[in-house]
Amino acid sequence: MFSRDLTIAKYDADLFAAMEQEAQRQEEHIELIASENYTSPAVMEAQGSVLTNKYAEGYPGKRYYGGCEYVDVVEQLAIDRAKELFGADYANVQPHAGSQANAAVYLALLSAGDTILGMSLAHGGHLTHGASVSSSGKLYNAIQYGIDANGLIDYDEVERLAVEHKPKMIVAGFSAYSQILDFPRFRAIADKVGAYLFVDMAHVAGLVAAGVYPNPVPFADVVTTTTHKTLRGPRGGLILAKANADIEKKLNSAVFPGAQGGPLEHVIAAKAICFKEALQPEFKAYQQQVVKNAQAMAGVFIERGFDVVSGGTENHLFLLSLIKQEISGKDADAALGKAFITVNKNSVPNDPRSPFVTSGLRFGTPAVTTRGFKEAECKELAGWICDILADLNNEAVIDAVREKVKAICKKLPVYGA
């Protein structure tokens, strides 16, 4: 028998110390990684619940194990809320991650060797959209499109490549693109060549849910997303689609038993909470602020003479090119880290440096907005970053910024009393 008094602190001091240090880091550091956010205590409570004990292969009402009557309720809540949130007819909440959701889509609708057309990783796409190092680039004939000299997707190029290569699937989505995707144009191109249109909205799902970014569900054959990032839920994946019995059956079979075994019902419960939170009016205000904050930060960098890829942002993120400053993303990342500002180095279009070094930084505002930053704080923060980038080796500047960061983090904590 387990005692409910047996806590991590009492049982595993080493692990607990690392967890406490991470909690302190999250409170004292400013988080600007575009794919990161903070979940609510309710989401974390679900992930630490007794639901972690239950195995439930299959789907609600069609399980391979007994004792699933209550996890069926949990999973159906998540399904129904996801469908309501995104206006979808179909939702699969079982994918363990966004990459696994994407792999399931490929497994469902493609055969090995089929041609896919996706955004180049070097131009802002994602590994799972056909990058050569990913299974999506190894199992399928991956053709890549990119951005033009203005930092915008060249839809004429997308259409030309589609006509030339006749892909079975066109992938629309990104990990580092700051503008609005033209889903009707993608749909028209896909229809022209008889391809599936698959949209990976992992980065903007929260914005879509709040109505501040176009919803791809009406245009795509299938849509995937993560449930963290802007959606602010647990780490996990989600597949959505319009009503299509054939595609729905293929997707369900691809997730289970095709790509996964038993679902993580404790994570699915956390997804259900996340979707409920995203259905509230305050979530829309949050997402509107996320975009305002990103635009405020990008504006400061432009004023200070830095190059923002695509000239600005219409979502939660933007890329800063440091080619002109002859600074590597790796060095900039390290210097900002000393000041308790967490970012990630990122390749930029036509980057002369390797992906391990890069010439850019990616910034995102979901996490700082969660802790209460508005435009004023974000402009101030961008100014501090510019001060450091102007002289990476100036320890006095780094020390001064770190103290400012600690002060504003204390003023705007992630988790209040």
Swiss-Prot record:
Positions with a binding annotation for (6S)-5,6,7,8-tetrahydrofolate: L121, G125, H126, L127, S354, P355, F356
Entry cofactors: pyridoxal 5'-phosphate
Annotated Pfam families: SHMT (PF00464)
Listed name of the protein: Serine hydroxymethyltransferase 2
EC number of the protein: 2.1.2.1
Chain positions with N6-(pyridoxal phosphate)lysine modification: K229
Catalytic activity: (6R)-5,10-methylene-5,6,7,8-tetrahydrofolate + glycine + H2O = (6S)-5,6,7,8-tetrahydrofolate + L-serine
MF terms in GO: glycine hydroxymethyltransferase activity; pyridoxal phosphate binding
Keywords from the UniProt entry: Amino-acid biosynthesis, Cytoplasm, One-carbon metabolism, Pyridoxal phosphate, Transferase
Gene Ontology CC terms, in alphabetical order: cytosol
Location, primary (coarse class): cytoplasm
Organism: Pseudomonas fluorescens (strain Pf0-1)
